Amino acid sequence: MSELHLLSTQQLITGLQDKQFSSLELTDHYIKRINALDSKINSFITHTSETARTQAKAADEMRVQGDKRPLLGVPMAHKDIFCTQGVLTTCGSKMLHNFISPYDATIVTNIDKAGMISLGKLNMDEFAMGSDNESSYYGAVHNPWNIGHVPGGSSGGSAAAVAAGFVPVATGSDTGGSIRQPASFCGLTGIKPTYGRVSRFGMIAYASSLDQAGSMGRSAMDCAYLLQPMIGHDPRDATSIKYDMPDYVQDLNDAAASAGDKPFAGLRIGVAKEYFSKGLDTEVEQAARAALKKYEELGATIVEVTITDPEITLATYYMLAPAEASSNLSRFDGVRFGYRCENPKDLIDLYTRSRSEGFGPEVQRRILSGTYALSAGYFDAYYIKAQKVRRLIVKDFEDAFANCDVIASPTAPTAAYKLGEDLDPATMYLGDVYTIGVNLAGLPALSQPVGLTSAGLPIGLQLIGQYWQESKLLSTAHLFQQHTDHHLQHSTIAKETV
């Protein structure tokens, strides 16, 4: 029972169904680990342990009464960007340090309906703006593989909690790589679905045309289990799209059942030289190419494709995302909710001081740059031009997919770097260089672990799919994981028993 946290989601489901352990025992096991070890990681902002124990007892009773929901009684946790009724929702910011949402985000409701048990809210970069989880008002998150290193961001708390064995799966959000990059840094699998696949209702907005919720776990199957209840059309989200509802878990099982010695026979994997250019760490490149070689050995065909120069994509993203952020975050003014400065002289002073004191440096930086891009005299030259380039980026992906089924690249140019390295903003932004194009195009993509550096830090490979092809991506990663053991490696903290 001391290693329950090392079990996969499928193993947890089987264990609960076969009465090897109860949901309460499982929940208590995770809570015990969190209480003993999270002081080293700082992955949680808010704990909901007592509520979780109550829900676990209820889940055990429902199972006895014949409830067959597969995820009934399985613990998880939410990134603190998703509104949770009656529970603190901070978005990692002083601005929302006292905000208790009056409603649940749609994905929170859906996951609750599936019977899962939330253990709390997870740390994150402030308002999802960052790539290292050092901008959180609640302190930096530490990487469970090496606590002197960053976990990635902005879903760093989610990645760290799963990698540390505090929860089997967690929700995340991805605006420019915020699920995939921390998944890479923490040795996990993490998927960003097609834009519109998962409701954004109740997810605090950063850049509305780019934000998308997704799932994180140790394996593709873990991700599939959590993603399943998250998807579906939501009339409360104008960007939610009605589309076929796949059964991800069944799709993965079917793919595995029909796979032969060459499970990837007929699969064309596109590889762009633009993803293997300057700035890519040697060990990361070696691991990515070794993974592609393994795909080839298992029957895949590697096809050379061309995509937009990542530096152009990066410039486009950092014009559009801050512009949307400056608009979205204008609602935080010290009047209706959130942080309010003390003793304002007048309304202008209230606005100015509440926002200056409530937002951290990185959020202020992006608001300022976004406001500049939207200002009179610069709107056409910057924002409109970036939107036109965005359309060309979409076209380049469409052209690439005419010759391949999925596109592969390193998830990030480096493995996790040290906490406190104090990278300048431009250098930090380059950490997203391989992931942001996916968000600009609205495509699905995942990161899967493919090895470790000589320092023992995880490396991820990104797989990009065509619209609505999450099953293709998850199945591809799942079959790869049937023939490799990268996803079975555990972090230093996960190996600790309590």
Curated annotation (Swiss-Prot):
GO BP terms: namely: translation
What positions constitute the catalytic site?
79, 154, 178
Keyword Nucleotide-binding part of the UniProt annotation: yes
Catalytic reaction annotation: L-glutamyl-tRNA(Gln) + L-glutamine + ATP + H2O = L-glutaminyl-tRNA(Gln) + L-glutamate + ADP + phosphate + H(+)
InterPro entries recorded: Amidase, Amidase_CS, Amidase_dom, AS_sf, GatA
Q: Which UniProt keywords apply?
A: ATP-binding, Ligase, Nucleotide-binding, Protein biosynthesis
**Cystine pairs:** none
EC code(s) of this entry: 6.3.5.7
The keyword Membrane is assigned to this record = no
Write one Gene Ontology MF term.
glutaminyl-tRNA synthase (glutamine-hydrolyzing) activity
> What are the GO cellular component annotations?
glutamyl-tRNA(Gln) amidotransferase complex
Q: Which Pfam families match?
A: Amidase
Question: What is its biological role?
Answer: Allows the formation of correctly charged Gln-tRNA(Gln) through the transamidation of misacylated Glu-tRNA(Gln) in organisms which lack glutaminyl-tRNA synthetase. The reaction takes place in the presence of glutamine and ATP through an activated gamma-phospho-Glu-tRNA(Gln).
Q: How does it assemble?
A: Heterotrimer of A, B and C subunits.
Q: Which family does it belong to?
A: Belongs to the amidase family. GatA subfamily.
Q: What is this protein called?
A: Glutamyl-tRNA(Gln) amidotransferase subunit A
Organism this protein belongs to: Psychrobacter arcticus (strain DSM 17307 / VKM B-2377 / 273-4)
Q: Its gene?
A: gatA
